[in-house]
Design a protein with these regions (language model features):
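Intrinsic-disorder/low-complexity detector
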Residues: 1-63
Length: 63
């Protein structure tokens, strides 16, 4: 169940990044609120498309 939540959560963050054409303050705060690192989300098995977006903007998300 927790893995499913993490997958949906990461999808929401990735979608917000796509809609905003990059990392907005809201996307950064949403990502941080989840409490997962990108590496942890990768282990959970999030969608490859979502993972690619999170990895592309990793530096901005984790600052």
């Amino acid at each position: 169940m927790a893995d499913d939540f993490a997958k949906g959560y990461s999808c929401a963050v990735a979608t917000l990044i796509r809609l905003d054409n990059g990392v907005s303050t809201n996307a950064r705060e949403l990502f941080r609120a989840g409490g997962w690192s990108i590496d942890e989300l990768k282990k959970v098995g999030i969608d490859v498309t979502d993972l690619d977006i999170l990895k592309k903007y990793r530096e901005e998300l984790e600052k």
